[in-house]
């Protein structure tokens, strides 16, 4: 299965901000952005060239792709579905990305990062409404109950991720029973509840050209 093999810290440095791709490390002073906030590569410290208009739009798309860990083909399919739905395409896009099972599992603290949560999903560690689902791109619907299997819940990694997520607090659009390793996807998140640094408007402009 295709996946992005670029080093995660390098991806954050490319965007110039934390994308929280490496779990707990991102919350410590060991984070690469804390130590080297400039772009990666031989000329990273000297990179001050202005991006072209296309470059700005492309960078906005790449940032969203990196945050949610989706490949170009997946992203285009998600955008097409967002455009097909009623409402604002940009908000629909982010909502669909947040409704992916790997993203919901991450928000519920079943993994320290989206990539770790994706691994839990693929390894048959997640139940949706009592049924095993191992497809990371599965779209969770409002009202769906997502939980760890008994085996996954017993793992030290999942326990640590749940405890860390609980200490930071859960988003408003989900509710989580940490003791049971179970959560409910209450509603699609509102745009105001999602990162302001994501510029989905530029993605719409990019794909409309």
Swiss-Prot record:
Residues annotated as domain S4 RNA-binding: 99-160
GO biological process: ribosomal small subunit biogenesis; translation
A cellular component annotation (GO) from this entry: small ribosomal subunit
Pfam families named among the record's database cross-references: Ribosomal_S4, S4
Domain of life: Bacteria
HAMAP family referenced in this protein's UniProt entry, alphabetically: Ribosomal_uS4_B
Family designation: Belongs to the universal ribosomal protein uS4 family.
NCBIfam families: PRK05327.1, rpsD_bact
General function of this protein: One of the primary rRNA binding proteins, it binds directly to 16S rRNA where it nucleates assembly of the body of the 30S subunit. With S5 and S12 plays an important role in translational accuracy.
Protein's UniProt name: Small ribosomal subunit protein uS4
Phylogenetic lineage: Bacteria, Pseudomonadati, Pseudomonadota, Betaproteobacteria, Rhodocyclales
Gene label: rpsD
